[in-house]
Amino acid sequence: MQHGRSFIGICVLLLAAACQSRDPAEPRAGPRIALVLKTPNNPFFIDMQRGAEEAARRLGVRLVVQSPEREIDVEKQMQIVENLVQTRVAALCIAPASSKGIVPALAKANAARIPIVVVDDEVDAAAAADAGVSTDSYVGSDNVEGGRLAGRHLVMASGGRAKVAVLEGIPGHETGDSRLRGFHEAIEVAPGVEVVSSQTANWERDQGFTVFQNMLQAHPEIDSVFACNDMMALGAVEAIAAAGRTGKIRVIGFDAVDDARKAIEAGSMDASIAQFPSEMGRLAVETAVRLVRGEKVPKDQRTKIGLVTRASR
């Protein structure tokens, strides 16, 4: 009998401990806000989720975070959105895996009268108009200006003479396309800066390594790289190291994730364009909550950017 009482006592203690382990800031009730990311594996989106979670705790709402495993899995992201619409979330925050491909899923959110906050990658305006899709607000960086910052830095750092390889994002992504547009605008002023190869590496580090390795073999004269995100840039850094050319090829990335900042400090990357994904996540959730409350919100909300170099750290 004594053993039975001891067992019951232990169970009670474990149950109490389990109850206490619950995050005290997590609301037991309140509107459910969905945040759909492109991937859980990119530090950029990890930071975005962190900012969103902080805002959700502070505002007393329940945050549901979901994403496909890979950024290129547009179909999976569409399925996630459709499922969230079925469960009647109060609002949807989404970083689209495809600016055009996500439009049919957003149409279902519109039909269910679920407010939509787009984060990071803008929805293609023409595709949305053709489908009769509307969104309530956009939260993100000025990617064209970020591309210009990268291009201006390359022109200055190279003295106006460079053989450049460009690692693009997924074709059709507004984010990557905007960064490329800004970059090309900036380097046009320097006729000595020549893009000798430009290919997609689909935002991924492994592909950044493979694609740039092939570029370097085809164009050994390459002395500079602009990658539309840091994951691809870090892949290029690894390919440069494998070729024994560390320190001889300048690499400029975009996002200023921790690994990129470490590479800049070590001298294996030259620069990166800093975004503030935590701020994006925070502002997206705050905007979604305002929409749920029936408040008016700005249609376009831009977060800050900046150039990170070894000198600026």
Task: Describe each model-derived feature in a short phrase.
Residues 74-90, 209-221:
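Short, well-structured alpha-helical segments in soluble
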Residues 15-18:
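C-terminal motif of bacterial Sec signal peptides marking the signal peptidase cleavage site
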Residues 44-58, 146-150, 174-193, 207, ...:
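Short, solvent-exposed amphipathic alpha-helices that sit
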Residues 28, 33, 77, 137-164, ...:
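Hydrophobic alpha-helical segments within soluble ligand-binding/sensing domains
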Residues 20, 29, 167, 171, ...:
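Hinge/cleft segment of the Venus flytrap/periplasmic-binding protein
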Residues 32-51, 55, 59, 64-82, ...:
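Extracytoplasmic "Venus flytrap"
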